[in-house]
């Protein structure tokens, strides 16, 4: 069992984009920004315990930070990890419930 403190650090935020919204509607997949050191088991456990839903599968991808320039200085944005969490049939998770009102 993962400690409650670690569960809260694994999931950073829901990732909201056009592609993520289409995935939610078509395949019941929610996209999260997660900790870079989090693994699939931790992500699945965190979603199940925090949102009380059943997870079917988890896919992850590390998004590389873009190189940015400000004047003569070059810098790089931080890398971050994105997790595609597919929920089991009949399960749903709605972040914008009541926001349209």
UniProtKB/Swiss-Prot annotation:
GO terms for cellular component: ribonucleoprotein complex; ribosome. InterPro entries: Nucleotide-bd_a/b_plait_sf, Ribosomal_uL23-like, Ribosomal_uL23/eL15/eS24_sf, Ribosomal_uL23_CS. GO terms for molecular function: rRNA binding; structural constituent of ribosome. Keywords: Ribonucleoprotein, Ribosomal protein, RNA-binding, rRNA-binding. One of its GO terms (biological process) is translation. Part of the 50S ribosomal subunit. Contacts protein L29, and trigger factor when it is bound to the ribosome. HAMAP family: Ribosomal_uL23_B (MF_01369_B). One of the early assembly proteins it binds 23S rRNA. One of the proteins that surrounds the polypeptide exit tunnel on the outside of the ribosome. Forms the main docking site for trigger factor binding to the ribosome. Belongs to the universal ribosomal protein uL23 family. This is Large ribosomal subunit protein uL23. It comes from Histophilus somni (strain 129Pt). The lineage of its organism: Bacteria, Pseudomonadati, Pseudomonadota, Gammaproteobacteria, Pasteurellales. The gene is rplW.
